[in-house]
């Protein structure tokens, strides 16, 4: 690997929590989890150095700064959206320098060979340096692309992730919270796409009541896109944190599944066969495995967490589940002044927080 690739590409195996400035919090934490012995996807990160190099080579910093200064009211949605579209267009038409482009393509080829799949499906996930911190929840404000195959599509998806740093939601959020645009670089994770039988999110505390002795799991067949889009309600599970005893298990009518279409090379929505619509997505053994993993992550960081998990379609009893993201739990802390009796709405949660970039 040449010098430029060393600057632009870092493998998950070489990351930990000290690499957030290089890899963003999302992918850096995956490296830390792997060092804990927790199963995470294979992959690499296109570093913040690569982002800065792309911005500088296209003289984007000054142009973006000038456009951001035109926003006079962060609450004016039309104004923010107009500027956002202009900035994202600037980024999406800008050329990625050849050496950076080659580094991304070569690393994808190396990952494909490592995973024994010459046209490996990947998850291209934004990983901003200020994302998912305990005091500023960026969850769901940046883009993720599932099922990306081929070197050229991968490069294009990386550029789209960079552009998502300037969505209207992200722009407005930074302006309202006095966060710098110039000091918020975007890294991008390129991760092997797990062949999901089911996927979901798990909390180490109850996200509505704040109860520290209850863990909550939400999930659906396949990937989480159908939940994000609000077309399916996930199963809801509550477990005692101390004894891992199943306390509540609500099985939803899951009519839609997000599945990978190998012919199209993308994740698509399909109708779920009637046999599986009202079937539980997880066995008790899988529920316990997820909860023990989440508890280990909470113990590591010493604060409540929410975790995105995937059960591989080839998983056998006793195997680990795959963790694709972890972050500080912010739902309850952001809503702690609201009534704890509010009814938990899994679709509203997922649309706002889970399964997103």
For the regions a protein language model found, what residue spans apply to each?
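N-terminal beta-alpha lobe that positions the nucleotide/phosphoryl donor
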Residues: 1-187, 198, 278-285, 290-302, ...
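Segments forming glycine/polar-rich beta-alpha architectures that bind adenosine-containing cofactors
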Residues: 199, 205-206
């Amino acid at each position: 690997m040449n010098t430029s690739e060393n600057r632009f590409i870092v493998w998950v195996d070489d990351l930990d929590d000290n690499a957030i400035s290089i890899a963003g919090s999302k992918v850096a934490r995956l490296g830390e989890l792997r060092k804990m012995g927790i199963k995470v996807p294979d992959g690499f990160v296109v570093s913040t150095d690569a982002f800065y190099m792309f911005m500088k080579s296209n003289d984007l910093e000054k142009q973006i700064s000038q456009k951001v200064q035109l926003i006079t009211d962060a609450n004016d949605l039309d104004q923010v959206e107009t500027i956002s579209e202009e900035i994202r267009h600037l980024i999406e038409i800008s050329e990625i320098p050849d050496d950076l482009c080659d580094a991304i393509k070569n690393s994808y080829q190396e990952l494909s060979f490592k995973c024994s799949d010459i046209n490996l499906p990947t998850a291209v996930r934004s990983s901003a340096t200020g994302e998912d911190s305990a005091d500023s929840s960026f969850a769901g404000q940046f883009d993720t692309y599932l099922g990306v195959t081929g070197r050229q599509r991968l490069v294009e998806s990386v550029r789209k992730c960079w552009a998502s740093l300037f969505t209207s939601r992200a722009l407005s959020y930074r302006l309202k919270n006095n966060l710098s645009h110039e000091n918020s670089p975007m890294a991008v994770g390129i991760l092997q796409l797990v062949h999901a039988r089911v996927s979901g999110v798990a909390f180490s505390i109850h996200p509505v009541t704040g109860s520290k002795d209850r863990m909550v799991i939400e999930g659906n067949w396949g990937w989480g896109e159908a939940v994000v889009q609000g077309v399916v309600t996930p199963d809801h599970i509550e477990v005692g944190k101390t004894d891992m005893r199943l306390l509540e298990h609500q099985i939803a009518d899951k009519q839609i599944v997000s599945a990978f279409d190998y012919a199209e090379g993308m994740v698509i929505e399909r109708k779920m066969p009637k046999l599986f619509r009202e079937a539980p997505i997880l066995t008790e053994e899988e529920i316990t495995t997820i909860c023990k993993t989440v508890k280990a992550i909470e113990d590591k960081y010493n604060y409540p967490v929410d975790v995105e998990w995937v059960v591989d379609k080839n998983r056998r009893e006793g195997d680990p589940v795959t963790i694709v993201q972890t972050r500080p739990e912010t739902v309850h802390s952001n809503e702690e002044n609201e009534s704890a009796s509010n009814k938990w709405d899994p679709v509203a949660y997922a649309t706002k927080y889970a399964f997103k970039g």
